[in-house]
Regions:
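Short acidic active-site motifs
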Residues: 70
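Alpha-helical cap/lid subdomain in secreted, periplasmic
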Residues: 73-215
């Protein structure tokens, strides 16, 4: 009887796919692949409802140093031909780091967001924008104008939040919590700039909870 029940559960289990778009914060610079936030999110989701659905390994299009236009070019090169059940977008820190104007970022970010919506099968409620972390609180920023960095990150995140609302997608603020822990060793990768798996776990918990509500 137990074997029959397992077969029934398997027949109704839904397989979900997840596309993660971004930069170093998505690929997980200096952490193991399973410790980046997309992989941790999938692991959490598969633990929460193991008999109801299963997320396959996330497809990640992200690389350290990418700006919005570089991510867009990489998406073109990937020639994505399928749709995904969930799409996340976290991009912009390198635009800020290179001193690019916020107005230009808004144009390129909203274009990427529209592409993300298309990849979700035109389901904006299945698209999740994550806020840009503040690298100014990390040891890497020693000797730099931390307030200026914070102000610029806030301006970029304002664009992300308003654009997410305008296109009816989700916005997840991970920056506030990251600013609290961003100078603590256990929340940092060895380079003193990028997050550790422990920091990514916090993001994954928030994202997984939001995804469950959206499904």
């Amino acid at each position: 009887m137990q074997e029959v029940d397992q077969k029934v559960r398997s027949s109704i289990m839904i397989n979900y796919s997840y596309l993660a778009l971004g930069d170093s914060y998505t690929i997980g610079e200096q952490v193991l692949p399973e410790d980046n936030f997309p992989y941790q999110t999938v692991a959490l989701l598969n633990k929460k409802e193991p008999d109801s659905y299963h997320f396959t390994a996330p497809q990640i299009i992200a690389q350290t140093g990418w700006t919005t236009d570089e991510l867009d070019a990489a998406i073109n090169a990937a020639a994505i031909s399928k749709q995904y059940d969930i799409v996340s977008l976290l991009i912009g820190v390198n635009n800020q780091y290179r001193g690019r104007p916020v107005n230009n970022f808004k144009i390129e970010f909203e274009y990427l967001l529209q592409r993300a919506i298309q990849f979700s099968g035109n389901k904006p409620t299945h698209v999740f924008v994550l806020s840009i972390p503040d690298w100014g609180v990390t040891p890497f920023a020693e000797g730099r104008d931390r307030k200026q960095v914070a102000d610029e990150i806030d301006a970029y995140n304002s664009v992300c939040q308003k654009s997410a609302a305008a296109f009816k997608t989700h916005f997840i603020n991970i920056t506030t919590s990251q600013r609290e822990d961003g100078n603590k060793q256990e929340f940092l990768a060895p380079d003193g700039l990028h997050p550790s798996g422990k920091e990514y776990e916090k993001w994954a918990i928030e994202l997984a909870d939001a995804i469950i509500k959206a499904l």
